[in-house]
C-alpha cells in the first residue's frame, strides 16, 4: 500500500519516525508531503526528506494517511490543499491514523462529527466541539480512523493501524 504523511516543520519527531519505519517494515511505500520540497525538521532536531508538496498530491494515488503531531498540524490545517486531501481520504473510508495534535487537520476538514477518538489532552475541547466522542485511551479505533494521544501510545497506535491495513 501507498501511505501518505501530511506534516511540516516542528512535527513531533518520534510520532513521524516510528510509524514511518514501522510501515516500511511492513512492506508499505511511505511518502511525506509538506509545504515545500527539501527537508523538514522535527521539534527535537530530526530531519526528513519531503517527497512531494501538498499541491502535487493526488489522494487517489494513496491508500492510507498518517497525521503525526507536534506543532506541525497547527500550520498544516491552514493549508486548504492539505485539508482537502485529509477530507477526501477520510471520507472515502481510507485508513487514517492520527496522534497527538494530528487530529487538528481532521477537525479543519470537518469529518469528525459523530466519531469516537482520542488526541493529546490539550485539544480535547477542540475534539469535543468538533463532535468527537473523546476517550482517554492509548488507542481508539472507529471504522477507518485510528487515534492515539502521546508518544507513549505509539506501539498500540501502530499495532492497530497495521491491522487495519491488512
UniProtKB/Swiss-Prot annotation:
Keyword Hydrolase: yes
Enzyme class: hydrolase
InterPro entries: C56_PfpI-like, Class_I_gatase-like, DJ-1/PfpI, Peptidase_C56_Deglycase
PROSITE patterns in the record: PEPTIDASE_C56_PFPI
List of catalytic residues: 100 (nucleophile), 101
Catalyzed reactions: N(omega)-(1-hydroxy-2-oxopropyl)-L-arginyl-[protein] + H2O = lactate + L-arginyl-[protein] + H(+); N(6)-(1-hydroxy-2-oxopropyl)-L-lysyl-[protein] + H2O = lactate + L-lysyl-[protein] + H(+); S-(1-hydroxy-2-oxopropyl)-L-cysteinyl-[protein] + H2O = lactate + L-cysteinyl-[protein] + H(+); N(omega)-(1-hydroxy-2-oxoethyl)-L-arginyl-[protein] + H2O = L-arginyl-[protein] + glycolate + H(+)
Enzyme Commission (EC) number: 3.5.1.124, 3.4.22.-
Subunit structure: Homohexamer formed by a dimer of trimers that assemble into a hollow ring structure.
Protein name stated in the entry: Deglycase PH1704
Amino acid at each position: 500500500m501507498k501511505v501518505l504523511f501530511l506534516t511540516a516543520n516542528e512535527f513531533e519527531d518520534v510520532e513521524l519516525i516510528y510509524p514511518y519505519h514501522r510501515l516500511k517494515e511492513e512492506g508499505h511505500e511511505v511518502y511525506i508531503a509538506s509545504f515545500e520540497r527539501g527537508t523538514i525538521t522535527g521539534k527535537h532536531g530530526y530531519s526528513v526528506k519531503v517527497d512531494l508538496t501538498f499541491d502535487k498530491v493526488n489522494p487517489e494515488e494513496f491508500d492510507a494517511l498518517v497525521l503525526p503531531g507536534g506543532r506541525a498540524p497547527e500550520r498544516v490545517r491552514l493549508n486548504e490543499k492539505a485539508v482537502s486531501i485529509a477530507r477526501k481520504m477520510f471520507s472515502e473510508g481510507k485508513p487514517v491514523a492520527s496522534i497527538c495534535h494530528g487530529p487538528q487537520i481532521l477537525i479543519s476538514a470537518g469529518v469528525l462529527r459523530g466519531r469516537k477518538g482520542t488526541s493529546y489532552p490539550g485539544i480535547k475541547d477542540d475534539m469535543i466541539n468538533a463532535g468527537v466522542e473523546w476517550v482517554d485511551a492509548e488507542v481508539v479505533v472507529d471504522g477507518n480512523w485510528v487515534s492515539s494521544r502521546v508518544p507513549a501510545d505509539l506501539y498500540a497506535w501502530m499495532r492497530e493501524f497495521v491491522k487495519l491495513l491488512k
